[in-house]
Amino acid sequence: MGMKTKIFWTRAAVAVGAVLWTGTATAGVRPCSNIRFEQLPRLMLYGDTTRLGPDRPFAKDPTVIRHNGKYFMYYSECSYAKDRVPKNVPKFRTWWWGGIATSTNLVDWTRVGNIAVEGAPETVGWVAPCVKKFDGKIHIFAQGHDAKGIDAPKANSPKSLNVLWHATSDDGIHFKSDTDKPAFIARNEWSLNRAIDAEVYRVGDRMMLMYATREHPTGKIQQLGMAWAKYGSAYGIADWHELSIQAPFFKPERPWEMKCIEAPTVIQRKGIWYMFYAGAYNHERQQIGVAWSADGVNFTRWRDEPVFPHGPEGSWNAWESGHPGIFEDDDGQVYLFYQGKATLKGDYRLSCVKVRFED
């Protein structure tokens, strides 16, 4: 027997005395009993050397798709080292920016260049991207600072106003936007006007958007908000509707999560949505947890402890396994991409493992 989606954290549902829509969940459904991770035959480690030099590879925030027989990985690059700033390049192009690399085997990656979007303000960095294929297009949702003219009374400062941008591509490299306006800005009762770490996924006729933000007014605790748009819409600023109006739908509550939940990434397996997420800030020992949902909206922790912790002392990820990006290949095999660092000096690189969901 089907049951309706229950949404406990939005005034909209309470105000009308009903749910927002009927979910596809079934009474009694349960998540898998075990999630197992397997290393690839060769360790995948990727770092971009463009900005810090050959001795300091760096990459964060991975997201991966497969397109025309090739794998595309999108990620964040840090600002240029002072001694490596290119000449005759606008200052804003030396800041944090999104990068692109390609591979044929998920292990060996070649840098293609930076994310560039025709039609969007040139100062948008397209950082911490979420890239998905749907509607016959490749869609990117990423964060940027350029939000001139946006009313944001709860931004901690105009310079740190983070909003989400959207663009599409046919080939995975050249992106276009039909507007010079951001796609989403957080407007709720509990957070700053801040949205980073976008994740989009489909639930019925809705496209769901998860984002990380910080509580108002201190901005010390990172939590997750959720919005939805009609599937097939333009996914612009007029299309998204906040669900987490009164409170976050997910926040740090376990000791290892400390004061931060961020980087949600979602996959559906056998009628269950699994959300992998990062707990604790990057300057701490970030690790990866999992929550699950029967309706794609209300999520419960699958385990109280991290399912993918940082590595042992002396390993490349001894101080972090964080910012997950889930990817399902054409053959159904699921991979978890993630960032890691060996020290607290920010020496981030990217890797991946196979994921097995076991009943």
Give, region by region, the residue ranges found by the protein language model:
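Active-site/pore-lining binding-face segments in mid-to-C-terminal subdomains
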Residues: 263
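A short, acidic, amphipathic alpha-helical segment used as a generic capping/interface helix at domain edges
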Residues: 320-326
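Bacterial N-terminal signal peptides that target proteins for export
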Residues: 3-13
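Bacterial N-terminal signal peptides
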Residues: 12-21
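Beta-rich carbohydrate-recognition and catalytic domains
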Residues: 27-126, 132-193, 201-259, 267-317, ...
